[in-house]
Amino acid sequence: MTSENPLLALRDKISALDEELLALLAKRRALAIEVGQAKLLSHRPVRDIDRERALLDRLIHLGKAHHLDAHYITRLFQLIIEDSVLTQQALLQQHLNNTHPHSARIAFLGPKGSYSHLAARQYAARHFEQFIESGCAKFADIFHQVETGQADYAVVPIENTSSGAINDVYDLLQHTSLSIVGEMTVTIDHCVLVSGATDLNTIETVYSHPQPFQQCSKFLSRYPHWKIDYTESTSAAMEKVAQANSPRAAALGSEAGGMLHGLQVLERIAANQTQNITRFLVLARKAINVSDQVPAKTTLLIATGQQAGALVEALLVLRNHNLIMTKLESRPIHGNPWEEMFYLDIQANLESQVMQSALKELGEITRSMKVLGCYPSQNVVPVEPA
């Protein structure tokens, strides 16, 4: 008997347990859907913070008998609770908007393997049984596909914790007829991807979209001899490296995307920010209603007067109504030098009385105002144990 045989036997047992865990997680999600249906009838909020905290406390107590530490149980069940909350939110939204689509065509930046492609898959997995992929070369093409009916939804990045706002997308939001109907966040884990055996010092040219280069500039500064070559998406960079099949070429992108192109990870990169997260927006031709049982966001686009304090006056309206603003972004108005538009994300349902009152006041003091959309907030703040 070789020394590896006991290890293989143990791994087989672990694999069998993993399959049992998957089956149990599927059963738990099915029960979460039943809970969502019950809340739909009783009109109770999706989130019950007291129940979530009591659940964590009970599981931590039970875990001690199995020698499982509190941190491990907390992290594991926070993720399970998040999935339950988002699953119930999707259920309530489908019922309210009478949408139960079997499939949808989603437009995103880049071919398969781009971060936008991964975000589109994430959104589709929770909302549709199937989704038809429609990769685009430019952000403008994504908007055009949905505006003209070639696609049902657009998934576009709007901001990143490391490189900041995606200005091209903000500019397109100024003029589009589309409405924001959803959001999601994707953790970005960049890797140096190569086609075969090589090392970091052998690489001469690195391909990627401008965003990964910005987000990983500290890492890249260690290799000043690398030539930086910009591509329209991370997946386009991967395609180039796969086709070149050279030890001197590499791409910056995700491990999952690299696998789709037959690339392997040479190095996992530490981005400039410890948490490198990109927020994506989902847009459609028709605005949606958001259940008052679900935490909501409303995104506005306003233009204020040129007089001193005009923006402050607008923001005071939100404060006076106890509305929480989670994002404020300014962009120039094309054709009007030195004038700016302001994008505001507000934690409120568009149809709520307080939001309607605030909109009325804002309409009286701003030069223009546009509601870009009201949509369910995907930021499920984890509950900590007592």
Model-identified regions with their sequence ranges:
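Domain-level signature for soluble enzymes in the chorismate/prephenate branch of the shikimate pathway
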Residues: 1-386
